[in-house]
């Protein structure tokens, strides 16, 4: 009896500690944003010059060096490019937002081509799951800022390219300062709020925006705010519902697909800078990696009543894009919170109280993910089968036992809550719980040898 009381108190304390840590993290993030806001608000334009938030400047180059001629000779002999094109590139500055699967190849080709100045924006750090597609990062730079890691690789590729690192997130209060002095901006991000932020800022500052995306085996590419072409809001005046948005962390992506789109973003940026070719404005390039087919379709022209780029815009300053879109401006794990911690199970509780007893453990990840790794007693029932009730054919008899605990898990503890919500509606008298933090928490707190992805 005493042991049971101690276990109960221990569990309660752990929950309180977890809740306090979450609250502390949230407050610290709010504090950082407030400090950034105050810092930027109190600086004048002149004070910003020279620090990491200022875009590059410097003398205008009027001739090529012997090293330039040797290094760029194969593109110098292109009739539409030539010496003048190389000089334009050498005097240009490009801001790449997101040093991931798109940003890495884009930066690599821009640096190799002789772009004079590159700005690299990324708040994140290098981790092993990046390596298959984020080709500028390496094993020995795990934990390093992605912007700094990319700078090291790009300097080795072309020491004549000046690199400015912005190892921070873009917010409405700092975006204009960072973007202002660059000639072209590349959107290599993986989230909707940042796409709106970049588009709005580029319209206000009259900067072309080369926008790419890649997911699974597909990719898309277009150029916004160029010539008479539309902005992002012209095409998407209303953001999609959060549940309709999938990033590569959840949906997966093949590295060669991000490489294809990222390289083409570099190509479009070069065309914009040099003034050559037919820039992909007012058109959308769609790449189907499964069949290796490229399609080029026309998209709508400027929207006369666009809230941002019309003659009489309704939006005249950057807004709260997370609130506007109803989702976080990051592709990091943003936990779903459908239930309080009292209505869920920690992995420690499950391991200590339930795992050794009769129960039904349902893993709701897609089959492809279940095959990567699984707990020995888990039954794979993908979330889609939970939601359409097709799981009843497989598990109906087991679920007739109201005394049998039902535990659901997924990779991070998000989809499992959706499954719990559905099962509780159908089986209101059953004990149905999900594991907080999913398999990632299992690795962190129970079995460090269990693989994570």
From Swiss-Prot:
Residues at the active site: 248, 410
Annotated binding of ATP, by residue: 101, 122, 129-133, 146, 190-191
Principal EC category: transferase
Details of cofactor binding: Binds 1 zinc ion per subunit.
Cofactor(s) the record lists: Zn(2+)
Keyword terms: ATP-binding, Cytoplasm, Metal-binding, Molybdenum cofactor biosynthesis, Multifunctional enzyme, Nucleotide-binding, Nucleotidyltransferase, Phosphoprotein, Transferase, tRNA processing, Zinc
Residues that bear Phosphothreonine: 62
Biological or metabolic pathway of the protein: tRNA modification; 5-methoxycarbonylmethyl-2-thiouridine-tRNA biosynthesis; Cofactor biosynthesis; molybdopterin biosynthesis
InterPro entries associated with the record: MOCS3/Uba4, Rhodanese-like_dom, Rhodanese-like_dom_sf, ThiF/MoeB/HesA, ThiF_NAD_FAD-bd, Ubiquitin-activating_enz
Membrane-spanning segments: none
Entry annotated with the keyword NADP: no
Binding-site positions, Zn(2+): 231, 234, 306, 309
Catalytic activity of the protein: [molybdopterin-synthase sulfur-carrier protein]-C-terminal Gly-Gly + ATP + H(+) = [molybdopterin-synthase sulfur-carrier protein]-C-terminal Gly-Gly-AMP + diphosphate; [molybdopterin-synthase sulfur-carrier protein]-C-terminal Gly-Gly-AMP + S-sulfanyl-L-cysteinyl-[cysteine desulfurase] + AH2 = [molybdopterin-synthase sulfur-carrier protein]-C-terminal-Gly-aminoethanethioate + L-cysteinyl-[cysteine desulfurase] + A + AMP + 2 H(+)
GO terms, molecular function: ATP binding; metal ion binding; molybdopterin-synthase adenylyltransferase activity; molybdopterin-synthase sulfurtransferase activity; thiosulfate-cyanide sulfurtransferase activity; URM1 activating enzyme activity
SUPFAM superfamilies (alphabetical): Activating enzymes of the ubiquitin-like proteins (SSF69572)
Localization: Cytoplasm, Cytosol
GO process annotations (BP): Mo-molybdopterin cofactor biosynthetic process; protein urmylation; tRNA wobble position uridine thiolation
GO cellular component, as recorded: cytosol
Record domain Rhodanese: where: 355-451
EC numbers, comma separated: 2.7.7.80, 2.8.1.11
Record's keyword annotation contains Nucleotidyltransferase: yes
Record-linked HAMAP family: MOCS3_Uba4 (MF_03049)
Family the entry assigns: In the N-terminal section; belongs to the HesA/MoeB/ThiF family. UBA4 subfamily.
NCBIfam families attached to this UniProt entry: PRK05690.1
Function of the molecule: Plays a central role in 2-thiolation of mcm(5)S(2)U at tRNA wobble positions of cytosolic tRNA(Lys), tRNA(Glu) and tRNA(Gln). Also essential during biosynthesis of the molybdenum cofactor. Acts by mediating the C-terminal thiocarboxylation of sulfur carriers URM1 and MOCS2A. Its N-terminus first activates URM1 and MOCS2A as acyl-adenylates (-COAMP), then the persulfide sulfur on the catalytic cysteine is transferred to URM1 and MOCS2A to form thiocarboxylation (-COSH) of their C-terminus.
Name of the protein described by the UniProt record: Adenylyltransferase and sulfurtransferase MOCS3
Organism annotation: Drosophila sechellia
Upper lineage: Eukaryota, Metazoa, Ecdysozoa, Arthropoda, Hexapoda
Gene expressing this chain: Uba4
């Amino acid at each position: 009896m005493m042991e049971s009381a101690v276990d109960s108190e221990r569990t309660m304390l752990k929950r309180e500690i977890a809740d306090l840590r979450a609250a502390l993290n949230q407050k610290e993030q709010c504090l950082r944003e407030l400090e950034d806001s105050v810092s930027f608000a109190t600086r004048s334009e002149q004070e910003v010059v020279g620090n990491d938030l200022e875009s590059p400047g410097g003398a205008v180059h009027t001739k090529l060096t012997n090293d330039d001629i040797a290094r760029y000779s194969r593109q110098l002999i292109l009739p539409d490019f030539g010496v003048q094109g190389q000089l334009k590139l050498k005097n240009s500055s490009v801001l790449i937002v997101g040093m991931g699967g798109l940003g890495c190849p884009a930066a690599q080709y821009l640096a190799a081509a002789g772009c004079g100045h590159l700005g690299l924006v990324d708040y994140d750090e290098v981790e092993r799951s990046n390596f298959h597609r984020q080709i500028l990062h390496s094993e020995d730079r795990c934990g390093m800022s992605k912007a700094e890691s990319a700078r090291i690789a790009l300097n080795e590729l072309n020491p004549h390219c000046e690199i400015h690192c912005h190892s921070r997130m873009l917010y409405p209060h700092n975006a204009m300062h960072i973007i202002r002095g660059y000639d072209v901006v590349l959107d290599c991000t993986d989230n909707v709020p940042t796409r709106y932020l970049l588009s709005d800022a580029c319209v206000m500052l009259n900067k072309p925006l080369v926008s790419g995306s890649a997911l699974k085996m597909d990719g898309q590419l277009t150029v916004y705010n160029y010539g008479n072409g539309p902005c992002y809001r012209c095409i998407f005046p209303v953001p999609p519902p959060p549940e309709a948005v999938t990033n590569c962390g959840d949906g997966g992506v093949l590295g060669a697909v991000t490489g294809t789109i990222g390289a083409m973003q570099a190509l479009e940026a070069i065309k914009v800078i040099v003034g050559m070719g037919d820039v992909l404005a007012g058109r959308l390039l769609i790449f189907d990696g499964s069949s290796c087919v490229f399609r080029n379709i026309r998209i709508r022209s400027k929207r006369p009543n666009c809230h941002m780029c019309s003659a009489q815009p309704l939006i005249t300053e950057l807004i709260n894009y997370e609130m506007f879109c109803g989702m976080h401006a990051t592709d990091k794990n943003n936990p779903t919170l459908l239930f309080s911690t009292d209505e869920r199970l920690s992995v420690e509780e499950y391991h200590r109280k339930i795992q050794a007893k009769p129960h039904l453990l349902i893993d709701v990840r897609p089959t492809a993910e279940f095959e990567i790794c699984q707990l020995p007693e888990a039954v794979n029932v993908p979330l889609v089968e939970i939601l359409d009730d097709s799981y009843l054919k497989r598990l109906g008899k087991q679920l007739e036992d109201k005394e049998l605990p039902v535990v659901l898990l997924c990779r991070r503890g998000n989809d499992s809550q959706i499954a719990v919500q559905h099962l509780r509606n159908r089986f209101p008298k059953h004990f149905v719980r999900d594991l907080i933090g999913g398999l990632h928490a299992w690795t962190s707190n129970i079995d460090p040898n269990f693989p994570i992805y």
